[in-house]
Curated annotation (Swiss-Prot):
Signal sequence segment: 1-20
Protein name listed in UniProt: T cell receptor gamma variable 9
Swiss-Prot/TrEMBL keywords: Adaptive immunity, Cell membrane, Disulfide bond, Immunity, Immunoglobulin domain, Innate immunity, Membrane, Receptor, Signal, T cell receptor
Protein localization: Cell membrane
Ranges where the Ig-like domain occurs: 27-122
Keyword Cell membrane: yes
Taxonomic source organism: Homo sapiens (Human)
Swiss-Prot/TrEMBL GO biological process terms: adaptive immune response; innate immune response
Known function: V region of the variable domain of T cell receptor (TR) gamma chain that participates in the antigen recognition. Gamma-delta TRs recognize a variety of self and foreign non-peptide antigens frequently expressed at the epithelial boundaries between the host and external environment, including endogenous lipids presented by MH-like protein CD1D and phosphoantigens presented by butyrophilin-like molecule BTN3A1. Upon antigen recognition induces rapid, innate-like immune responses involved in pathogen clearance and tissue repair.
UniProt subunit comment: Gamma-delta TR is a heterodimer composed of a gamma and delta chain; disulfide-linked. The gamma-delta TR is associated with the transmembrane signaling CD3 coreceptor proteins following the stoichiometry: a single gamma-delta TR heterodimer associates with one CD3D-CD3E heterodimer, one CD3G-CD3E heterodimer and one CD247 homodimer forming a stable octameric structure. Upon activation, gamma-delta TR complex associates with FCER1G to initiate intracellular signaling.
GO molecular function: MHC protein binding; peptide antigen binding
Cited PROSITE patterns: IG_LIKE
């Protein structure tokens, strides 16, 4: 087992913010990654068409308030929180699998957090 100096644990929990009949699920409960590697977290949408939604990703670090990270709108426009290093987070939406993925590049100790996905039906 690697020590905390070599790994970061990314806890993943689902947050449901849907207006309508959709359902949101994060199938991966937790993820442990080696520092400086890439982590990918998925959010699966059912009950509605993902391309008719905007998906938002947030994180909550231990002892801190929830922070908006990045979103992808129904038209594919990506919006990122100011102050977050460029290239740190990527978001995509895959209509064929009704999935949104948050990619975290160069995992650091500061990335230890609970990550939430939410969606807004257009």
């Amino acid at each position: 087992m690697l020590s905390l100096l070599h790994t970061s644990t990314l806890a993943v929990l689902g947050a449901l913010c849907v207006y309508g009949a959709g359902h949101l699920e994060q199938p991966q409960i937790s993820s442990t990654k080696t520092l400086s590697k890439t982590a990918r977290l998925e959010c699966v949408v059912s009950g509605i068409t993902i391309s008719a939604t905007s998906v938002y990703w947030y994180r909550e670090r231990p002892g801190e308030v929830i922070q908006f990270l990045v979103s992808i709108s129904y038209d594919g426009t990506v919006r990122k929180e100011s102050g977050i290093p460029s290239g740190k987070f990527e978001v995509d939406r895959i209509p064929e699998t009704s999935t949104s993925t948050l990619t975290i590049h160069n995992v650091e100790k500061q990335d230890i957090a609970t990550y939430y996905c939410a969606l807004w039906e257009v």
